[in-house]
Amino acid sequence: MAGESDKKGNIDDGVEIYMDFYKALQIGNWNAAKEFLNRHPHAISAKITANDQTALHVAAEAGHVHIVEELVKQMSEENLEIKDIDGYTALAQAAYYGGNCRMAECMLGKNENLIRIVTENRIPVVVALGNGHLKLARYLYLLTPLEILMPENGHMGATVVSEAIYNNALGKN
């Protein structure tokens, strides 16, 4: 049974093998995380939390750029597209929580398709805008293919404009 702590991405009994790995990722201890990966290589793409997050999700949410960069080096393009229980990729997590351009650049450098993956009816640029991460939103907007934003392809273009207006992202900066 999922408890309150599960909703916050904490470990439950089904993923207890990953407890030390999770803690290392949370606190930014790459040496401990790397040691765990050396012993358990499958953990690079495993869902290690009750919310089905991978190591990359956890590191992105915690804001540890150096760990994100190291994990991305070891992951396949497909691994970067893994979604958590809420449908978020690690890029969407970065757009939601931290707004770090280096994380986004690292992930998109390995898999350009991440810019197109929809989470809760939003592409990453909209997730960043909606959470006030304007620098990241501008970066993601520049990488977002124009066809995704065209009216004939859905509401994404209108959503980007609406979020930009709402968040005053169209200013002089």
What does each model-found stretch correspond to?
Residues 2-19, 27-86:
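Internal amphipathic alpha-helical repeat/solenoid segments
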Residues 17, 52, 87, 121-122, ...:
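Start-of-repeat signature of ankyrin repeats
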Residues 23, 58, 93-94, 127, ...:
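Ankyrin-repeat alpha-helix packing hotspot
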Residues 28, 63, 98-99, 132, ...:
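Ankyrin-repeat intra-repeat helix-capping/turn positions
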Residues 32, 66-67, 102-103, 135-136, ...:
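Conserved ankyrin/ankyrin-like repeat signature
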Residues 37-43, 70-79, 105-114, 139-148:
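Ankyrin repeat domain, specifically the short helix-to-loop turn at the C-terminus of the second helix
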Residues 47-49, 83, 117-118, 150-153:
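Ankyrin-repeat boundary/linker signal
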